[in-house]
Amino acid sequence: CTTEDQFTQSFILPYLLPMLENAGANVFTPRERDTQKQEVIVDNDGSLSGHGGQGSLYLDVKSRKARWEQTSRPGFAQRKRIYQDNENPFLSGTARFAKTEKKKDKAFAEWVPDIPETGEYAVYVSYQTLPGSVSDAKYLVFHNGGVTEFKVNQQIGSGTWGYLGTFTFDKGRNDYGMVVLSNESKEKGVVCADAVRFGGGMGNIARGGQTSGLPRYLEGARYFAQWAGMPYPVYGGYEGKNDMNDDINVRSRTVNYLAGKSLFNPTEEGLGIPFEMSMALHSDAGFSKEDEIIGTLGIYTTNFNNGKLHAGTDRHASRDLSDILLTQLQRDIRSTFNVDWTRRSLWNRNYSETRLPAVPSTIVELLSHQNFADMRLGHDPNFKFTVGRALYKAILQYICSQHGRDYVVQPLPVSHFAIRFGQKKNTLELSWQGEEDPLEPTAKPREYIVYTRIGRGGFDNGVRVSSPSHTVKIEPGIVYSF
């Protein structure tokens, strides 16, 4: 037995998202992706008194040529602990901007969180798109594993949370746990600084006079959309009278708003993020009295908007996407688990999540969560890995086919990992074997990245090596993880 929205998260969050992002994709989820219950927001407008992270620090430092000023557009501010319907925190505060410079170590903004407990926290940044915003705003995340650099295109994605990554931070306020935005850029223009959020947190949207009392990642998309600054028509089409229908529709409308004015949704207003496709992973109801596998169903919609998507593409592109996904899932599950996994059908039906998106979209009804034969595999982490990899490969195939490009599938995880003391003093010899994938001829390992963690810290940014072995220097008495 399982709850559908939590069960499908167990495929998406630990498996599919990392696979897509490791392959270079930019991914958005309409529900909170971080399972961390704690949340700290550091903002130029200050922290809410008595709220988590009240010891956090924001500061901005000017240079000789660039100083920080307040933007003319509103920014984020957390003025309340609990938000009512149609209250937008991204219209409650201010944001800061500075002119760019080509030299390093000039003007910068700094967000230092007061972390309530040691652990892993997703890091989200926010900013306003301004005249002259650059496409290479330089963010540095200082975490327990070191420093990780990101370049963010501030010409798109204004006034919402932009996910950078998930990192380990120690409890308290530390100079090795913070986010820095530099005004260094190859482009002449401005960078903008607004709130930075650490951790997924607890739900803070009140319905019926109270909040859910649940971590935000367990809540519906309607409530996350409000916290993420979406306009009311995106998440409140039923004006607070039918949250279930709003929760279904907001998933598509959020994609449309984020992609509005981009190449893939040029006809709608929005934030200009070029999302190319949308996939909803569901589990289905129903059971077999004969204890047979029910299997996977694909859903798409062609009979809408005169058969066209918003970029003018034929809506049968959604059928292509659905077909590729079902074909890959059936092939990989059958080959890996030696079961007669069923490809049920491709439905051309009128569903919100396949009708409303401006881009090619599909629903994958993976299996029946009421059917024992399906759920014998459903909770197996090896099955979840196989499903995640099949979905990743299908999406890769679809995107590359749309662009007329060849694709290479990322290799499988290594095996036979071993650690031995090195020939030189205070060294370790790491060795492993690259895994060939019998299902994917392109998935051949050519290079590897070795990540190191010292003590109970976080993993570093890794070292790329060309052979299945690596020598590392160590200090006696310290625990190392790889």
Residue ranges of predicted features:
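Short beta-strand-plus-loop segments that form exposed binding edges in beta-rich domains
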Residues: 179-190
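A short beta-strand element within beta-rich, extracytoplasmic domains
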Residues: 95-97, 107-131
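Beta-strand-rich modules
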Residues: 471-482
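Short, surface-exposed beta-strand/strand-loop-strand elements in extracellular ectodomains
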Residues: 129-148
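Active-site-adjacent mobile loop/cap segments within catalytic or ligand-binding domains
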Residues: 94, 99, 195-203, 283-307, ...
